[in-house]
């Protein structure tokens, strides 16, 4: 039986759909109280309706990369629940598909700010509010693209590789404070974010994976919940590939 997360409070950024929403549900199923974030109040309301967890789930609207939203979210969680035991950095963007050498500087800055620096900022606030004194668990969302480049996706992969290195560094620095920091690196998951890689071409997408299918949000969510829980109490600084075996293949094989 999975370890109970009763009396644990989690923040899941980007928690209104896809992997983030599935993660919130998995944490709730283990007994945690969860705060999800998202940019749209309508999407937050819909997500909370789907979660159907009553007072154990709240939502805060705002831009995940903005300091004011980070401050307001952590302050509300502390005021309502008294702790921040788990942080899941689930927000990521990929607004550019093309050659990395042609990546506009302003887009590069936006990607790095949202995909990497925001994760650090959220961590810092959670550490200052609670984790620095009481310990905690952080799970960052990276990508299989961090390990292997592909056409048009190199820039996104670079930010996700940085996320892995950030995970390792924070894990090393914060272990004495009993803060565990890990990451997950999914392959193609059937979400709106990754729709262009599977929607309308599911057979080809599945063929790229030795296990014969693209991932589901729940595949990733359950791994995140495991890493966040006491089941992973002696695991830190690790990145778990959840990719249906994709990284076992070569780039040539996956594109054949």
Role assignments for model-derived ranges:
Residues 123, 159, 167:
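Active-site helix of classical SDR
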Residues 71, 94-109, 132, 152-155, ...:
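Conserved mid-core segment of classical short-chain dehydrogenase/reductases
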Residues 101-120, 139, 163, 211:
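Catalytic Tyr-X3-Lys loop
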Residues 175, 180, 235-237:
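Short, small/polar-rich loop/turn modules that mediate ligand/substrate recognition or access, typified
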Residues 128, 172-173, 233:
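Alpha-helical segment proximal to the catalytic Tyr-Lys
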Residues 94-97, 225, 236-256:
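Short C-terminal tail/terminal secondary-structure segment
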Residues 16-18:
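Conserved glycine-rich cofactor-binding loop
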Residues 143:
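Residue(s) in the substrate-gating loop at a strand-loop-helix junction
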């Amino acid at each position: 039986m999975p370890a109970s997360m009763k009396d644990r409070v989690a923040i899941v950024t980007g928690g209104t759909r896809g992997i983030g929403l599935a993660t919130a549900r998995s944490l709730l199923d283990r007994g945690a109280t969860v705060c999800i974030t998202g940019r749209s109040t309508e999407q937050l309301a819909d997500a909370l309706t789907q979660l159907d967890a009553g007072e154990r789930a709240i939502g805060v609207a705002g831009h995940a990369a903005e300091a004011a939203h980070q401050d307001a979210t952590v302050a509300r969680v502390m005021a309502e629940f008294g702790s921040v035991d788990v942080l899941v950095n689930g927000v990521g963007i990929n607004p550019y598909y093309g050659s990395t050498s042609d990546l506009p500087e302003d887009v590069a800055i936006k990607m790095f700010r949202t995909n990497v620096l925001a994760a650090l900022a959220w961590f810092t606030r959670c550490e200052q509010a609670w984790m620095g004194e009481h310990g905690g668990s952080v799970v960052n969302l990276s990508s299989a693209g961090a390990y292997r480049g592909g056409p048009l996706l190199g820039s996104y992969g670079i930010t996700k590789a940085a996320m892995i290195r950030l995970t390792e560094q924070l894990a090393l620095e914060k272990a004495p404070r009993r803060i565990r920091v890990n990451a997950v690196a999914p392959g193609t998951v059937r979400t709106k974010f990754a729709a262009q890689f599977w929607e309308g071409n599911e057979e080809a997408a599945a063929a790229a994976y030795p296990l014969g299918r693209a991932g589901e949000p729940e595949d990733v969510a359950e791994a995140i919940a495991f890493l966040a829980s006491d089941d992973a109490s002696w695991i830190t600084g690790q990145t778990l590939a959840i990719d249906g075996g994709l990284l076992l293949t070569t780039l040539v094989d996956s594109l054949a």
